[in-house]
């Protein structure tokens, strides 16, 4: 299946149903009073994280999603039916942004996590709500409000523990093939890897971690050159980055400059990638003499100002790979993933008499009071029967 990690969709929540103007009319009850019911609330739009999905390709073809409108109120104080909600399934790891404002609405990082992205409109009030001592036969109602409408940008970020960095042909895909069951394409030309891939590294029956391989970076990637800039976002959730440096580049380029290119692109990209733990791994030591490999690695580390430990490996024949993987496993155990628990603020409980409806009723009552003028003289009141007078 084609890997698609970005999509734009339009979501429209349902409008609220309108209130009804109606009066009770039955045999022997000619003036039964108002009985218009309220409308129904509009349906909401939700996103649901599903671990069985791994691409956003479905939303390249289906781009519009609309929740159901609330039904209008009816006579006999019948309330309209609430509109049905709509649920859109997305892969775990999807980031949701409002395209208009750029606001991050949420990160779908857990299976079955739900996120409301569109609130349905409020129902309108029927004329029975406006009955009062001064307005026995109200002919007012309110219409339902519009549901939320917005364009969303969905970005799929792979959930991996370890991310691979390096120029094209640094040996990233070969490494992930050597340590996991993943089989990304491997060849002797640049940009063999066109899309990210994940591999599970199993150290024993109880310990494992996930490694992500992304297309190689080139100079100017942070400005849009090459393929890597599109996929650097997949490294944002990694706990450690493995920076692979080719000790014997096929194009005879300078490994020191190659390593500096990657470091510079991380700093230019931002999003905290440059501050993440990064390990220096020298690959393809099997292509040169062992002493020469150690000499080159030492020179590169000194030129980069690298004081931490570095590794010499050959991903092709798995030389030095197992100790590296165990060190990664121990690092991950010592630095467990911090699951961000969003402390959701207590939501305002919205009943039928919410602020919107209170304002509507207050306006109508104010108008009715202004129209009602009583001079306390019963003689000029039309339609008033004097029952008793002293």
Swiss-Prot record:
Chain coiled-coil ranges: none
Location(s), subcellular: Cytoplasm
Residues that, per the record, bind GTP: 166-173, 191-195, 213-216, 283-286, 314-316
Domain Obg: 1-159
UniProtKB keywords: Cytoplasm, GTP-binding, Hydrolase, Magnesium, Metal-binding, Nucleotide-binding
Gene Ontology terms, MF aspect: GTP binding; GTPase activity; magnesium ion binding
Domain OBG-type G: 160-333
GO CC term, one of those recorded: cytoplasm
One Pfam family from the record: MMR_HSR1
Annotated segments matching region Disordered: 128-147
PROSITE patterns: G_OBG, GTP1_OBG, OBG
Class in the EC hierarchy, top level: hydrolase
Function: An essential GTPase which binds GTP, GDP and possibly (p)ppGpp with moderate affinity, with high nucleotide exchange rates and a fairly low GTP hydrolysis rate. Plays a role in control of the cell cycle, stress response, ribosome biogenesis and in those bacteria that undergo differentiation, in morphogenesis control.
HAMAP family named among the record's database cross-references: GTPase_Obg (MF_01454)
Quaternary state and interactors: Monomer.
Protein known as: GTPase Obg
